[in-house]
Amino acid sequence: MIKIGASILSADFGHLREEIKKAEEAGVDFFHVDMMDGHFVPNISMGIGIAKHVKKLTELPVEVHLMVENVDLFVNEFEEMDYITFHIEAVKFPFRIINRIKSIGAKPIVALNPATPLDAIEYILGDVYAVLVMTVEPGFSGQKFIPVMTKKIRKLKSMIVENGYDTKIFVDGGINVETAPLAVKAGADVLVAASAIFGKDDVKTAVKNLREAALEALNKDFLTKSFNSNEEKQ
């Protein structure tokens, strides 16, 4: 089952309570909160207070995405969060960060920028809950999905399966009804969308269309693999 996370980067912060409620009623599975420091990425976004406020406004899980240089300074601020995502490019001691996240009761997710090779996470792949594949350059909402990232997602899926891990694949960046099927066919388990949800007049319909597009791709992929498997047996 494909899960959908609503990134509040595109939400109306002047009416955040209402935005959260609309997304909940639309059927999103969790909320994704980006935190940018203006150093790791050029933009500055939500601070610690906003992430904590979102957590108070919903019963759904909340993931905080740390797009910051000094991950160590921020992890302990988010002990009430369900998932904490850090960038492999920002840390020297990833196992230490992973263990710290686990120690406060959250699930660790490691993120990779588009140009970062999968080799960078090879040795921590079995220790994280998920890998978040950035399909745009991090820092700004509304960017276009980078098509070649589907190759990266497929390779990551193969690494996970070959090693017998249960690690999930999150995909974040440029996700909409056109690109969601591409990510799902490549192996994504979770889709994070911002403007494709909060940028729409009818949030409920937007989430419905996004989920249907993802599930249709998943079902087609399953049927194709089943057909090919039967052909090989004959």
UniProtKB/Swiss-Prot annotation:
SUPFAM superfamilies: Ribulose-phoshate binding barrel. It comes from the Archaea. Binds 1 divalent metal cation per subunit. It is an enzyme of class 5 (isomerase). GO terms for molecular function: D-ribulose-phosphate 3-epimerase activity; metal ion binding. The active site is at D34 (proton acceptor), D172 (proton donor). It catalyses: D-ribulose 5-phosphate = D-xylulose 5-phosphate. Its EC number is 5.1.3.1. Keywords: Carbohydrate metabolism, Isomerase, Metal-binding. Substrate binds at S7, H65, G139, F140, S141, G142, D172, G173, G174, A194, S195. Pathway: Carbohydrate degradation. A divalent metal cation binds at H32, D34, H65, D172. It holds the Pfam family Ribul_P_3_epim. Its cofactor is a divalent metal cation. GO terms for biological process: carbohydrate metabolic process; pentose catabolic process; pentose-phosphate shunt, non-oxidative branch. One of its GO terms (cellular component) is cytosol. Belongs to the ribulose-phosphate 3-epimerase family. Catalyzes the reversible epimerization of D-ribulose 5-phosphate to D-xylulose 5-phosphate. This is Ribulose-phosphate 3-epimerase. It comes from Methanocaldococcus jannaschii (strain ATCC 43067 / DSM 2661 / JAL-1 / JCM 10045 / NBRC 100440). The gene is rpe.
